[in-house]
Curated annotation (Swiss-Prot):
It holds the Pfam family Cpn60_TCP1. It is an enzyme of class 5 (isomerase). Its main location: cytoplasm. This is Chaperonin GroEL. Keywords: ATP-binding, Chaperone, Cytoplasm, Isomerase, Nucleotide-binding. It comes from Haemophilus influenzae (strain PittEE). PROSITE patterns: CHAPERONINS_CPN60. ATP binds at T30, L31, G32, P33, K51, D87, G88, T89, T90, T91, G415, D496. InterPro entries: Chaperonin_Cpn60_CS, Cpn60/GroEL, Cpn60/GroEL/TCP-1, GroEL-like_apical_dom_sf, GROEL-like_equatorial_sf, TCP-1-like_intermed_sf. GO terms for biological process: protein refolding.
Length: 548
């Protein structure tokens, strides 16, 4: 076991605080409408330019191990805020730094760290309750646009795109962010249910100019197994040919003789058929086939429930208004499924989302909900260079998470005003069990001004003057750093999601409280490289002797 380096008391806290300040100072320059960029060097490729707090925090590793421990703990604050609300990482870092700095001053003055921590926890709990009282629902398209704009660092086009996307696919819908091909940002909405499986043979194509298969009013045959024998398919094919409608086969796979016969029939015009693989794998494939069945009022032909493909009839087939297939995707538009059954299925999947503990599973289940409920929106981010594209995608991603958080828990006045108002409201009535807890309460409430002060500092103004003016105001009165004007923050469109502000404060206080109560730090002693080199050199000499 390696030898350890141990530091106690003030020595440990000074080192830890230095690490906290290095990381927080790097992150906080990005805060607010006039926040600056940070350039991150990469081991290969061009450097990344970002205004995303958590991206900056993740890059920072310090050489001194004690300082690095402090930095890593603040990094945890940014990561947790990002995981919980998808935004507010810089605010969380600024709050953590302010609470740790104030707290360690009090500890150095001889206060009891545990009582300070209890005071901080009381203040945070009271302010979180007050934030919920200040919160108002985020319902209109305009409010959603404003939240998106603020989170994308005052990029109004991003705010508009997110608002339009939510209008098209609903607030629960899936909105994804992809690289665009031009310079402009675009919104692409996929109506109906789309899954990432294309046609099994290019000979099915009936629209050569777009290289797609288009089927109008088709039947859909859903099969939970591989089809390789054409005899199994003949009864269904004959029924569909008599009905004079096209057929889409969705199965685990269609291969060999079965696929060849379908292609020949299609080319001769005997029956219009296309085949695609079923989406997903394993249990997820079964579930997605069932989703398609409910959407199109069909039945999944599965041997697990005693159904055989040879005995399938037209009643077992689903129907839709239109199906479009290209080499990568299949889109089913306007399935004839019963509305009540579709809603029941959506409710069932939502229940699974509630119970799931895996983020990946939740994401996949959310996608299924969106596909059943009516569509997926894709925001295509345009930029002149790849470096700009990465930076912009980060901002769009943040804005998307922030708007979701706003829809979930509502909005409060932005620009750090909500924390100042909530802190002022609880300051008069909140009391600790002893004087040291009261000091903890006061230092936490004072630290809650830090985001407002940092936004103002980044805008090149005097933080104390603005903070004093905002504190003397009432309600949503605050300072718009973008236009350098005072006024009603909500009317000016400067909004923050309540969830983002709440999460930032809770995570910052949690980690800051642990750091204030730290009395000892332990790390590995660095290895003595010189000794290792000496030993290696001696070995070399011995080798030379052998050669003599």
């Amino acid at each position: 076991m390696a030898a350890k380096d141990v530091k106690f008391g003030n020595d440990a806290r000074v080192k830890m605080l230095k690490g906290v300040n290095v990381l927080a100072d790097a992150v906080k320059v990005t805060l607010g409408p006039k926040g600056r960029n940070v350039i991150l060097d990469k081991s290969f490729g061009a450097p990344t330019i970002t205004k995303d707090g958590v991206s900056v925090a993740r890059e920072i590793e310090l050489e001194d191990k004690f300082e690095n421990m402090g930095a890593q703990m603040v990094k945890e604050v940014a990561s947790k805020a990002n995981d919980a609300a998808g935004d507010g990482t810089t605010t969380a870092t600024v709050l953590a730094q302010a609470i740790v700095n104030e707290g360690l001053k009090a500890v150095a003055a001889g206060m009891n760290p545990m009582d300070l921590k209890r005071g901080i926890d009381k203040a945070v709990s009271a302010v979180v309750s007050e934030l919920k009282n200040l919160s108002k629902p985020c319902e209109t398209a305009k409010e959603i646009e404003q939240v998106g704009t603020i989170s994308a660092n005052s990029d109004s086009i991003v705010g508009q795109l997110i608002s339009q996307a939510m209008e098209k696919v609903g607030k629960e819908g899936v909105i994804t962010v992809e690289d665009g091909t031009g310079l402009e940002d675009e919104l692409d909405v996929v109506e109906g249910m789309q899954f990432d499986r294309g046609y099994l043979s290019p000979y099915f194509i009936n629209k050569p100019e777009t290289a797609t298969v288009e089927l109008d009013n088709p039947y859909l045959l859903l099969v939970d197994k591989k089809i390789s024998n054409i005899r199994e398919l003949l009864p269904v094919l004959e029924g569909v040919a008599k009905a004079g409608k096209p057929l889409l086969i969705i199965a685990e796979d269609v291969e060999g003789e079965a696929l060849a016969t379908l292609v020949v029939n299609t080319m001769r015009g005997i029956v219009k058929v296309a085949a695609v693989k079923a989406p997903g794998f394993g249990d997820r494939r079964k579930a997605m086939l069932q989703d398609i069945a409910i959407l199109t009022a069909g039945t999944v032909i599965s041997e697990e429930i005693g159904m055989e493909l040879e005995k399938a009839t037209l009643e077992d087939l689903g129907q839709a208004k239109r199906v479009v297939i290209n080499k990568d995707n299949t889109t089913i538009i306007d399935g004839i499924g019963d509305e009540a059954q579709i809603k029941g299925r959506v409710a069932q999947i939502r229940q699974q989302i509630e119970e799931s503990t895996s983020d990946y599973d939740k994401e996949k289940l959310q996608e299924r909900v969106a596909k059943l409920a009516g569509g997926v929106a894709v925001i295509k981010v345009g930029a002149a260079t790849e470096v700009e594209m990465k930076e912009k995608k980060d901002r769009v991603d943040d804005a998307l998470h922030a708007t979701r958080a706003a829809v979930e828990e509502g909005i409060v006045a932005g620009g750090g005003v909500a924390l100042v108002r909530a802190a002022a409201k609880v300051a008069a009535s909140l009391k600790g069990d002893n004087e040291e807890q009261n000091v903890g309460i006061k230092l936490a409430l004072r630290a809650m001004e830090a985001p407002l002060r940092q936004i103002v500092t980044n805008a090149g103004e005097e933080a104390s003057v603005v903070a004093s003016a905002v504190k003397n105001g009432e309600g949503n009165f605050g300072y718009n750093a973008g236009t350098e004007q005072y006024g009603d923050m909500i009317e000016m469109g400067i909004l923050d999601p309540t969830k983002v502000t709440r999460s930032a404060l809770q995570f910052a206080a949690s980690v800051a409280g642990l750091m204030i109560t730290t009395e000892c730090m332990v790390t590995d002693l660095p290895k003595d490289d010189k000794a290792d080199l000496g030993a290696a050199g001696m070995g070399g000499m011995g080798g030379m002797g052998g050669m003599m």
